[in-house]
Amino acid sequence: MNPRAWLTGIVLALGLTIHAAAAEPENTIFMDLEHGRVVIELLPDVAPQHVARIKELARAGFYDGIVFHRVIPGFMAQTGDPTGTGRGGSEKPDLPAEFSSLPFERGTVGMARTANPNSANSQFFITYADAPHLNGDYTVWGRVVDGMRHVDAVAAGEPPSDPTAIVTMRVAADVAE
């Protein structure tokens, strides 16, 4: 193996690990899947109401056990519906759109909604690849900073025959490690 390539790989891996560890705990989500932990950096400056909702629901244990009900390879994985059908949500009121100029790239976390732009509630999705057709039409509230390989391992389907579930989802500040 080329020593320069090896060293570059080590530096990149360390950089990602340090970035994930150095993230502000109050604005970091730990989403544990059966395959491992996904670390999501929250973006409260971009979508304050959506970030507040995600944190509120995570702190209440709302997402624990909820399945990824819509997973399209090469596009996105969607979860956050307690019924597992894509039609449900929390008992909280829907949120107004907080669209931004942030692009949907691999690992972007956005809020799912109906055709009504002000209908986001608890469902969210993580993009597998750049999705420019979503830009400006869906609220971006986070980005995966570590563990995207675990999102890649989520079972595909609409719905998947054996769906992957969120084991636990917590605000990092609330997790003792």
Name what the model sees in each region:
Residues 3, 7, 11, 15-177:
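Cyclophilin-like peptidyl-prolyl cis-trans isomerases
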